[in-house]
């Protein structure tokens, strides 16, 4: 069953630990969960050819799993969640663009 910050299932978590040689990783540790998500997104990009920046499809692959991803169109709830994730990702992307523009301004004078 899924557990921890990443809601990772046991089998996939064990695969992550083997492939990353991170034998002491635990689903209850935030740092490990974040690393797991990065590993999963990277692997999803390679296995299913889903771009890392495609929040909609990446979410569906995470929610359904690699094996059942192809059937996501039958899962209306997953599609609703994925649209919400996509919208949130777009909001964050816009905010990051604004932040970057503000950080690039030379508004501080160093003497």
Where in the sequence are the language-model features?
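Short, solvent-exposed mixed-charge patches
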Residues: 110-111
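Alpha-helical segment that forms one wall of the substrate-binding/catalytic cleft
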Residues: 3-57, 61-70
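Catalytic and substrate-binding regions of cell-wall glycan-acting enzymes that process beta-1,4-linked
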Residues: 53-107
């Amino acid at each position: 069953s899924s557990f921890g910050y990443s809601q990772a299932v046991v089998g996939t978590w064990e695969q992550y630990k083997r492939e990353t040689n991170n034998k002491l990783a635990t689903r209850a540790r935030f740092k490990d969960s974040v690393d797991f998500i990065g590993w999963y997104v990277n692997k999803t990009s390679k296995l299913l050819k889903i771009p890392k920046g495609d929040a909609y499809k990446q979410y569906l692959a995470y929610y359904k799993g690699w094996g059942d991803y192809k059937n996501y169109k039958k899962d209306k709830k997953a599609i609703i969640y994925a649209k919400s994730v996509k919208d949130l990702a777009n909001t964050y992307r816009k905010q990051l663009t604004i932040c970057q523009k503000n950080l690039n301004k030379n508004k501080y004078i160093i003497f």
